[in-house]
Structure formats: C-alpha cells, structure tokens
Amino acid sequence: MYPIKKFFLLISVIGFLPAGCVQNENKRSDPSVKSLASVPAWTKEAIWYQIFVERFRNGDRSNDPTPADMYGSYPDKIPKDWKTTPWGHDWYSHEPWLDSIKANGFYSKIQARRYGGDLQGVLNEMDYIQSLGVTAIYFNPLNDSPSLHKYDARNYAHIDRNFGPDPKGDVMIMDAETHDDPATWKWTSADKLFLKIVDEFHKRGIRVIMDYSWNHTGKEFWALNDIRKNGKNSKFVDWYNIIQFDDPSTPKDELKYEGWGGNNPYMPVFRKDIIPPDDKIMPFEGNLHSESLKQHIFSVTRRWLDPDADGNPADGVDGFRLDVAGEVPMGFWREYRKVVRYVNPEAYLIGEIWWLEWPDKLLDPRVFLQGDQYDAIMNYRWYRIARGFFGQADPVLTPAGFVQGIHGINRSLNIENLQAMMNVTSSHDSPRLSTSLFNKTMDKYNAKPSDNPDYKINRPDQLTRKEQMLLLIHQYTFPGAPQIWNGEEAGMWGADDPDCR
C-alpha cells in the first residue's frame, strides 16, 4: 500500500513547490520558529480510523449509561422505561420508550438513544483494528459528558464516566477535585483504561489523537455550575458570555448565556475577544477572553500529551483534532500550538475547518496552515470535488473540471500541509460514503428523510458501489492521509447526522 501511494504522490505533486524540510528536536525546549512550523513526518503516511466510542462496541455492560448520567443533555426528561438500545436495532424503528419522550419529532427523540459503547469495546477489538492496516486512530470526544456525542463537556480533564469500568467511583474522584487546580486531579478508572489503550496502540505502531472542543462546553460543565451557584461572584464568570444570572431565591434556573449556534442552551460558548469586535466572518483574529480558561485548557492538553509529566511524551496521545476550529480566534491557536509543541514536537494538530456559509461555501484553510496554528484540516473540500467527479453528484464535474477543482484547492498549500491533510469521505457529521454517492443531490444538504422524503436510505445499488471503489482508489493514491469512519470498512450506509452514527 505504501509504495503505490508514494508513487502516485510523486506524480500528483508535480507543479507544487515544496517547502524546505525541517527536523524537530525531540527534547523539551521552547520550540524554534522552524520546529514550530514543521509538520510531523508520521502524519504524511497515516491511514486514519475514526472511532465514535458510544457507537463502536459495548465491551462492558456494567458501565452502561443511566438517565442520571445523561442529565444535562437533550432531551431533558428521560422516561422511566428507558433502556439502552440493542445493537442491530433498526435505526428508523421506535423503541418502546421513544414515543414517551416529549420532544419535537423522531430526530429530537433519538438523541436519548444510547448503545453503551465503551473503551473496553475498543480494547477488545485491537486485533481487528490493526488488521485493517490503519496506522492512526482519531477518537471522537472522550471527555466526561452527558450526551451521546460528547461535544458538551462536563469535565475536560477526565474520560467519560460510562466509557470506563467504574462510573460511580469515577464520579466520586471527580467530585473530590478542585477542578481548576491540576495539582488535585487524579486518574479515574476510565482515564487509566484510556491510557492503557494508548499504550496498546503504540505497541502496534498506531498513533492516537483526541477530539476536543475549546469553543464551548456543556450546560453541566463545572465552571458554569459554579456561575449558576455563585453568580457575579464566581471566579469563572469571565469564561462565558453571561446574559442573565440565576436568582437563588426561586426554584427556576434563570441563568442565560450565549450558546453555540445562537441560543443553544446545551452548548454554552466561551467568551472571545474578536478583533475587530464587529467581525462576523471567519477566520477571526483575537483570542479567548479569560486567561484562567486558557490555562485550564493548556493544563488538560499537557495532561494527555505527557500523562506522567516526566518530559517524555511517549506515554501520551499524539495530537488533537480541534472541533469547530474556525470559530475560535486565531490568537488562541497560535498560543495553543506552542503549548503542544513544547510538550511533544511531533504532535499533530488538525482543525475542523469546514463551512464559510452553509451549504455551498467552504472556508479557505490557508490562513490556518502557515505553521503557527494547525498542521492540516479535515479535507471536506477535497471530498466535494471527488464526489462531483467519481459520483457525478451535484456539483457534477467533467474530467477537466475535476482537475481544475483539485488544482484550485491545492496549488496554494504548502506541500507538507497537503500531505498531512485528513482526506475525509464520511464522518460522524456527514452521510456515509455509499449513501452520499447513491444520492446525487448536493452533499450535506437535505440529506436525510426528515429534510427530503426522496432521499434514498436503502442499500446502495451496484453502480454506487463501483463509484465508491473508484473514489477510494483515488483517496488512497492522492496526496494526504486517507480516513475511514468506523463501519465504512463493513460497507455500512446511512444518511446525514445522526443517521450516520
């Protein structure tokens, strides 16, 4: 696989001007400008496997989520007869408890589904994952969180309670800590199991990155609960954009704050200093407002990069996927890169740079790939062009249009960044590859039955499978690192989020 990829890589990059190669010093020192800007060599030959733990495998039924664990996620009230959903359940059929949920429609109600996937399930499938030939793992968020997706953190410093073997014991450990003091942080059973998994993957020559959102938390995040309790006197009050404080004299929770996407109460966003203040178009100059918030994020980052803090990052993760990265001011990312590279000069930073204006305008990533922020992005721009040609889907491309499109998105990129791109065909946020090709409408637009009753959700036909094979050949021989969304290797199909999960 590697020789053919290198051969096609050589052909594909003719006409690009590569930047000078830079060697990283593998020692704890302030990174020089050159070492800070370099792209980790291992990322250029990576084959990524993306794991969404809650939906991967249930290896330990004793840690399955309960309604109490889900408190703070949508929907708010879980019926008494709620149970975890059995594996193999028909996605569009209703569990006995589903219609008891007071929520608007099927897609709102299934946010309460839990399958019980956990880290033991990942550990049990190590041989299977290795057999796929992958060399790097991208974990969707693992931080403690009440939701199925974990982008609404309760606690950044710990692995989700239901991903480890002792949820109740882990909660006791977390509750005993001073959350803003890293000196008090302990290792929960879930934390230890994750570190074991990192070690096992490393023994097999497989790298590991974690997914974090430094843009927002969940409504039950410990700092927001402190604001809920102490109001204006909370020392974390400058972390968020607080609109109204809670009135402790009433039973109602009156706390209001800016949420992701506007008024989403389940994902409060951090306060940012945008330069200029009225700038509404990404990317943004500026920074996160609170210095104590940044230091907390940096402490969590160091914790996973070098768990025993001995100066050798071999026991830690190999980088981070950065959620909704374009919504966070670039000044923060410049600081963040320095923190990460100080601990591990070979750590990989990949940003989720996607929409400028949904559903048809994608954000130009060049400003993020100047050596001071990320090494690469999730390359949805590449997939749109590849789908238009190999799948003859909207926007349909001729061979000449395909070549023009590929050159258009790549010609201005540093060759090292291009080689490290994660070339994404499907993910937790988009239709699965075969379903995306089976439907010829615009990708990620009206791409599930609730938005388009004509959207095809049945088994893709043989023509689609042939288109899929051609696109995959292109993916594995094109500059960049191919990515597999868990389940794609088994031929799974599915519409847009959440049907793809």
Regions found by a protein language model. Name each.
Residues 51, 129, 139, 156, ...:
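Conserved, mostly hydrophobic/aromatic
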Residues 101-121, 154-191, 219, 265-294, ...:
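The substrate-binding groove and active-site-proximal loops of carbohydrate-active enzymes
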Residues 27-207:
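N-terminal structural segment of carbohydrate-active enzymes
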Residues 198, 202, 206, 215-216, ...:
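Active-site-proximal helices and loops of the catalytic beta/alpha 8
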Residues 44, 60-81, 145-165, 214-265, ...:
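Aromatic- and acidic-residue-enriched segments that line the glycan-binding/catalytic groove
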Residues 8-18:
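Bacterial N-terminal signal peptides
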Residues 43, 59-107, 355, 404-408, ...:
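Loop/helix patches that line or flank the sugar-binding groove of alpha-linked glycan CAZymes
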